[in-house]
Regions:
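Interfacial loop-to-helix junctions that mark the boundaries of transmembrane helices
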Residues: 1, 48-53, 61-74, 188-197, ...
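Long, contiguous bundles of hydrophobic transmembrane helices that form the permeation core
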Residues: 3-14, 27-34, 38-46, 193-312, ...
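Core transmembrane alpha-helical segments of multi-pass membrane transporters/permeases
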Residues: 50-96, 282-343
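Membrane-interfacial loop-to-helix junctions in multi-pass transporters
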Residues: 1-3, 69-76, 104-118, 151-156, ...
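Re-entrant/interfacial helical elements at transmembrane boundaries that shape
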Residues: 98-100, 134-147, 175-184, 347, ...
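Hydrophobic alpha-helical transmembrane segments of multi-pass integral membrane proteins
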Residues: 78-81, 108-143, 328-333, 354-392, ...
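Short helix-coil transition sites and intra-membrane helix breaks within transmembrane domains
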Residues: 22, 72-76, 86-97, 127-139, ...
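Membrane-core helix-loop-helix motifs of multi-pass transport proteins
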Residues: 141, 145-232, 246-256, 400, ...
């Protein structure tokens, strides 16, 4: 009975999310229904013994309050600090300076499709400092896209490479990485170094080759003629105010160092390098913002304007709270509902009885997240919703939580780039003047290679 009830709620919630209902609201409502059903049918409890308010209907809201309190003081503040810093870097043009500086060595290469693949690899490493897939794609469309097309690459091939440059959310300051590290029980830097880097080392060269072959073959199939153009002749559609600012911003070259300050601080003062000095993500982001603010004052000589621009940092924090942290909390609330009905225990027991085991459950969850990421156009929403189930499943199946959460997180970001409705695809295709549906035909093969390699590498290296 409990399995049937849970299945109906889960299917209903999935249908609503696919119909573009607000994911946070759907997860909160579905989680509340599961908890209510669990209490009415005496399948489980909502709060631990001694924590109840005395009325189970009140316990549901007390659980939400507890989740908000716990998440906002730890994981939530980390995510908000990262979001605020990223917005401030965009505001002062530091992200643009970093991209403009790092693409210069690529000018020395003459083969159009090698330059295109190298641009994709460069974008993957830029993603360590610039965590927004859409933001990074926008910057590369303004700076690198005209160069690629001028070398002879077709507009759609250049856009496909740029739109997939952050197909692995593998930065230690990425919101998904921070969350995955907490689920796995590791410091974000240790998690990044121990688990994400080995996967990235397997994925990056293979996807670069896949891009080279896919785009070259499909350009030839479509009758594209490789010929050099003047970069000034290559048009880029700049429609939004943010895109205009990114295109017109010409910050000092030294600003290229500002986005990497927090990353450098996190890595240097970590157990990997200098374990005697403590550094956390929030401190690194605040220090990076303070240094950037000083640099901005010397650039503008306007103290009032410099102080005023810091509002962007706070706005960025608020945006992360509204868009990311609420999904994390809603997903955790939904997971509590699933657990309270006993469905997770039943699923694990069924898997063990049939010999499916932890590996089979991991593959099923990976597949669900990949499909949801494509249909929803978001990697974070399905990952944050399902990742909260990992600790319970891992504990009862005897595998490390990192073995399950690692491919779930990375698959979400790769599958996202196959969706025609995801932000990065819409931004890149709009600036290139092509259809997002045509674009995902070019991103599908390289991203499929990425997804397969993530799973295989995870099983080979950590299985």
């Amino acid at each position: 009975m409990n399995l049937l009830f849970t299945a109906l709620i889960v299917v209903w919630a999935a249908w609503l999310i696919l119909k573009k209902y607000k994911p946070q609201t759907v997860l909160f409502v579905a989680g509340g229904l599961l908890l209510a059903g669990s209490m009415i049918m005496s399948w489980g409890t909502i709060l631990p013994a001694g924590k109840s308010t005395g009325m189970w209907s009140f316990d549901i809201f007390e659980l939400i309050r507890t989740l908000f309190a716990n998440r906002l003081s730890g994981l939530g503040l980390n995510i908000m600090a990262v979001g605020g810093f990223a917005r401030y870097m965009d505001k002062i043009g530091a992200s643009n300076a970093l991209v403009a500086l790092t693409i210069r060595p690529l000018m020395l290469l003459k083969s159009p499709y090698i330059v295109m693949s190298a641009c994709w690899v460069l974008g993957m490493f830029l993603g360590l400092a610039i965590n927004s897939a859409s933001g990074l794609a926008m910057l590369l469309m303004v700076t690198m896209f005209p160069i690629l097309v001028a070398l002879g690459v077709s507009r759609i091939s250049a856009t496909a490479a740029i739109a997939t440059t952050l197909c692995l959310d593998w930065s230690p300051s990425d919101t998904g990485t921070i969350f995955a590290a907490e689920i796995a029980g590791f410091d974000p830097v240790i998690y990044w170094h121990t688990f994400q880097i080995p996967i990235a080392c397997a994925v990056i060269p293979c996807v670069a080759i896949a891009h080279y072959l896919t785009q070259k073959i499909m350009d030839k199939r479509d009758g594209h003629i490789v010929r050099a153009l003047d970069p000034a002749e290559v048009s880029v559609n700049i429609e939004t105010e943010d895109e205009k600012k990114a295109a017109l911003s010409h910050p000092p070259k030294i600003y290229a160092l500002l986005p990497i300050i927090p990353l450098a601080l996190i890595l240097i003062f970590s157990p990997l390098c200098l374990p005697g000095i403590k550094m956390n993500i929030i401190m690194a982001m605040l220090m990076g913002t303070a240094i950037s603010m000083i640099a901005q004052f010397f650039r503008t000589r306007d103290l009032k304007e410099t102080f005023s621009e810091i509002q962007i940092f706070f706005d960025g924090m608020g945006k992360q709270l509204a868009n990311v942290i609420t999904i994390v909390i809603a997903g955790e609330f939904f997971a509590k509902g699933l657990t309270s009905t006993g469905s997770i225990d039943a699923m694990i027991q069924g898997a063990q009885t049939t010999g499916f085991g932890a590996s089979g459950l991991t593959l099923v969850m990976i597949a669900i997240i990949a499909v949801c990421a494509i249909l929803m156009g978001s990697g974070n929403a399905p990952f944050f919703a399902f990742a909260n189930l990992v600790p319970a499943i891992a504990a009862k199946t005897g595998v490390a939580a990192s073995f399950m959460v690692l491919p779930m997180h990375l698959i979400a970001s790769s599958a996202r780039a196959i969706s025609p409705i995801t932000g990065v695809i819409i931004v890149a295709s709009g600036m290139a003047g092509i259809s997002p549906f045509d674009l995902v035909k070019r991103t599908a093969i390289p991203m499929a290679v990425s997804c397969i390699l993530i799973v295989v590498a995870n099983f080979v290296i950590f299985g």
